[in-house]
């Protein structure tokens, strides 16, 4: 099977699970009244976790974490009702910190960035361009 989904009154309800064609779990998340609500986890084809976070009423809420395919941390991001808040931190695959962005009222208030060797550099990476699947 490739996915398992439950509907109630024509809307997604409960646990939704998807698998890669060879059986490895790809995605798992819960829905309530058709909206994403609860824990969401995605995995790469190699079995390594890709991202994990909570949705509430269809919006990202709380801490979201993501990882590179090699298992090293990619990002830690904070949300409230789908709006970016507080510090969002990003890393390169070599575990070197890439950037820290501080959000206030959903907008970048300040930022600091580094190159792959740990040297401070202008922030030309923008976290909004990185999308979850």
Describe the predicted segments one by one.
Residues 1-133:
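Glycine/tyrosine- and acidic-biased, solvent-exposed loop/turn segments at the edges of beta-strands
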